[in-house]
């Protein structure tokens, strides 16, 4: 799946803002690293969502259910982070925006940077209450095959494949 850059943005949130909201029940932090890494330490109150769980081709309804089980409702403020400078986190943020979630941001630092500057980490998993989330697909941010086919013929459109080199060569 691709996103149309003029239709979607992922604002960032700074460390101080996250620290101030870490215990706020209306905020959900999502750690997109592998489960083993999450279990070794994460930002307090963060839930784990390995990216592979979103890439299995599930229906939008299944994706909404997954986020609901993580305590993400329509009004939940979501902060996503990873250890790849946003490469994985941005995919989760895009997915949230695709299902119609309005309030999502990327943490401006990686987990490793968070840890290196001496901020608090935890190995405890938070107690999560499931939430209710609507499904309002934002199909304008999906670049379909038809869109790409017509866009490649236009002079004012630049198509950029931002996959990592190994994924691009597969």
Model-found features: residue ranges?
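Positively charged, proline/Ser/Thr-rich regional signature most characteristic
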Residues: 6-75, 149-170
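Thiolate-centered catalytic microenvironments shared by cysteine-dependent enzyme domains
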Residues: 2-7, 54-154
């Amino acid at each position: 799946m691709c996103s149309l850059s003029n239709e979607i943005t992922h604002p960032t949130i700074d460390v101080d803002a996250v620290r101030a909201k870490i215990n706020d029940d209306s905020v959900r932090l999502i750690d997109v690293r592998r489960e083993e890494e999450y279990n070794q330490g994460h930002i307090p109150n963060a839930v784990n969502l390995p990216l592979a769980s979103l890439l299995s081709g599930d229906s939008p309804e299944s994706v909404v259910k997954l986020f609901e089980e993580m305590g993400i409702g329509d009004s939940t403020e979501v902060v996503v982070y990873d250890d790849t400078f946003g490469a994985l986190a941005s995919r989760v943020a895009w997915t949230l925006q695709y299902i119609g979630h309005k309030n999502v941001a990327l943490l401006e630092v990686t987990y490793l940077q968070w840890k290196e500057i001496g901020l608090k980490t935890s190995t405890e998993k938070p107690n999560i209450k499931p939430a209710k989330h609507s499904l309002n697909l934002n199909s304008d941010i999906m670049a379909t095959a038809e869109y790409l086919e017509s866009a490649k013929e236009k002079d004012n459109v630049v198509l950029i494949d931002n996959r990592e080199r190994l994924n691009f060569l597969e």
